[in-house]
């Protein structure tokens, strides 16, 4: 577990959730398949129960990193709705003509936080005067910085702080934000960079 008392906001980083209808969903559909970013697991599971009860429609869900899901959809995966933690992957599918512009909505926001394993603390000043090598003595876990939204945002934040070249060798990059959260919960990384909504679990 991670403790909410060990959460610090990471400067200059946020995300936008983008929702798109991948294919036209029939008005009388018996089921709807939702592909959603792993960071939304709890929220979507709660909404799924409400939607199924109110509409008598089965909701099938698949969770992974936004990049993984986008590639699966491109390869023909049967998604009706795609909820991405990164607008770039929604753009990717839109450019492939798999999501129509008028079927897309950008909404919601999130922020990045630093987390530590339960029972451990971290005192850090998040500005350009701080030497991250003095603060981060162990591994730093986040999503893949090339493809997973949380990792891309983490890289952007560290770059803005002027820390990236010193942070990069310490990184453990994961397939999605939940995997990063679990690394920290098990004490395998000194800190993690995740979304505030994940840290609150």
Residue ranges and their predicted role:
Residues 8-11, 26:
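Residue-level detector of intrinsically disordered/flexible regions characterized by low predicted structural confidence
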Residues 11-22:
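Bacterial N-terminal signal peptides
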Residues 25-77, 84-87, 91-201:
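Exported/periplasmic ABC-transporter solute-binding proteins
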Residues 1-6:
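N-terminal secretory signal peptides that target proteins for export/translocation
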């Amino acid at each position: 577990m991670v403790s909410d008392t060990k959460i610090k906001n990471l400067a200059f980083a946020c995300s936008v959730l983008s929702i798109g209808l991948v294919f036209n969903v029939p008005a009388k559909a018996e089921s709807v398949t939702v592909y959603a970013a792993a960071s939304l697991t709890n929220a979507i599971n709660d909404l799924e129960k409400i939607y199924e009860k109110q509409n008598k429609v089965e909701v099938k869900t698949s969770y992974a990193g936004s990049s993984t899901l986008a590639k699966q959809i491109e390869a023909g995966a049967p998604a009706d709705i795609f909820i991405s933690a990164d607008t770039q992957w929604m753009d990717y599918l839109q450019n492939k003509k798999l999501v129509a512009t008028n079927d897309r909505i950008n909404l919601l926001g999130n922020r990045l936080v630093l987390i530590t394993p339960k029972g451990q603390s971290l005192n850090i000043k998040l500005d350009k005067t701080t030497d991250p090598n003095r603060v981060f003595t162990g591994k730093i876990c986040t999503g893949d910085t090339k493809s997973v939204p949380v990792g891309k945002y983490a890289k952007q934040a560290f770059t803005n702080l002027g820390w990236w070249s010193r942070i990069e060798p310490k990184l453990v990059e994961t397939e999605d934000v939940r995997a990063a959260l679990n690394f920290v919960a098990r004490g395998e990384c000194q800190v993690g960079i995740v979304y505030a909504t994940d840290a609150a679990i």
